[in-house]
């Protein structure tokens, strides 16, 4: 049985400091955005907005504030679906399975390389697309396999 080759979570220097940011340049999708640390609060939302290192949106400013207030050394934002859309109504009507699979690979990498605590932050937006609950269950199952706390 072959072992899955996971991507390497690498920190880079961006405006405002050292960040995790995948992909490393602005794209119409985003897998990972967060501060570097060993014990992050990993927040899972529905889909990414335009936020990037050094230019956080109000949601990510709240994630950062909550992580700091609760003693985490860092935070990482993931999303159930990685397509960037400032309005969830603009998300793909059907999921791009390649994006979904890569999103899961990056979550596996974060779980393997850090000691996270998870935070479910998808709310009722999970109902925006029929495919979102299934993708969310895939992500939750990964954390349960590794006994990651929520």
Q: Locations of the language-model features?
A:
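Active-site and ligand/interface coordination hotspots across diverse enzymes
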Residues: 1-57
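Glycine/proline-rich loop-helix segments at beta-alpha junctions forming the active-site rim
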Residues: 85, 91-150
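Hydrophobic/aromatic beta-strand patches that form the interior of the parallel beta-sheet core
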Residues: 42-44, 76-78, 119
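Short acidic (Asp/Glu) patches
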Residues: 27, 57-64, 96-106
């Amino acid at each position: 049985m072959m072992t899955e080759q996971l991507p390497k979570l690498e920190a880079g220097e961006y405006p405002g400091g050292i960040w995790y940011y995948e992909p490393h340049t602005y794209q119409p999708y985003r897998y990972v955005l967060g501060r570097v640390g060993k014990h992050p609060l990993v927040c899972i939302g529905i889909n990414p907005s335009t936020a990037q290192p050094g230019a956080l949106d109000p949601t990510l400013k709240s994630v950062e504030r909550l992580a700091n207030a609760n003693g985490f050394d860092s935070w990482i934002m993931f999303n159930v679906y990685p397509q960037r859309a400032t309005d969830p109504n603009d998300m793909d009507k059907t999921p791009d399975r390649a994006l979904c699979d890569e999103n899961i690979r990056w979550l596996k990498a974060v779980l393997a390389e850090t000691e996270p605590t998870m935070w479910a932050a998808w709310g009722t937006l999970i109902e925006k697309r029929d495919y979102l609950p299934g993708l969310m269950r895939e992500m939750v199952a990964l954390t349960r396999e590794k006994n990651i706390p929520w």
